[in-house]
């Protein structure tokens, strides 16, 4: 089974010139989802992972599944104003604009081992901002993993010093 065959490309979405990678066909297929989780688990570094951070909103899908498999807590990183408790905030640039993200201040204890997950690594801005949020909370990032990586945007360059794993790559 080739996971890449479950990703649909949508031209000029969300704006002209962007080739959007739609993972919903993969989400519709239970076997494809199971394979993705199995491959993520196989590529994790050894050792205990305390928390899995998922980035709003498509990062939540696999982050929750990985948290369950790892017997770890799940932490949502969300857009501003969506979390009810005190938060840390980080601004970032993305492929088609700019935004900011928030995490609950008390979501991670100092020294906890954290896995970061998102659906797509594009420019790296979202993931880099989330790494900063995790570190503000005192977490140690063990890996940043992604379902899809757009290698031509060189997002991995913003994640220097972190272990990065992507299951599907577009050159």
Curated annotation (Swiss-Prot):
Molecular function per GO: adenine binding; adenine phosphoribosyltransferase activity; AMP binding
Domain of life of the source: Bacteria
Transmembrane segments: none
One term under GO cellular component: cytoplasm
Reactions catalysed according to its record: AMP + diphosphate = 5-phospho-alpha-D-ribose 1-diphosphate + adenine
Pathway annotation: Purine metabolism; AMP biosynthesis via salvage pathway; AMP from adenine: step 1/1
Summary of subunit composition and partner proteins: Homodimer.
Role this protein plays: Catalyzes a salvage reaction resulting in the formation of AMP, that is energically less costly than de novo synthesis.
Protein name, entry field: Adenine phosphoribosyltransferase
Provenance organism: Christiangramia forsetii (strain DSM 17595 / CGMCC 1.15422 / KT0803) (Gramella forsetii)
UniProt lineage: Bacteria, Pseudomonadati, Bacteroidota, Flavobacteriia, Flavobacteriales
């Amino acid at each position: 089974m080739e996971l890449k065959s479950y990703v649909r490309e949508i031209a000029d979405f969300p704006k002209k010139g962007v080739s959007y990678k739609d993972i919903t066909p993969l989400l519709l297929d239970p076997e494809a989802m199971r394979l993705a989780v199995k491959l993520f688990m196989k590529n994790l570094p050894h050792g205990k992972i305390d928390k899995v951070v998922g980035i709003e909103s498509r990062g939540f899908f696999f982050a929750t599944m990985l948290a369950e498999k790892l017997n770890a807590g799940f932490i949502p990183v969300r857009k501003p104003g969506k979390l009810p408790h005190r938060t840390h905030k980080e601004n970032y640039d993305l492929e088609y604009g700019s935004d900011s993200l928030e995490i609950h201040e008390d979501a991670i204890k100092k020294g906890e081992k954290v896995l970061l997950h998102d659906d797509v690594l594009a420019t790296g801005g979202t993931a880099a901002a989330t790494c900063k949020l995790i570190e503000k909370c005192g977490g140690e990032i063990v890996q940043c993993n992604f379902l899809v990586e757009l290698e031509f945007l060189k997002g991995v360059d913003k994640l220097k010093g972190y272990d990065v794993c992507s299951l599907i790559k577009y050159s």
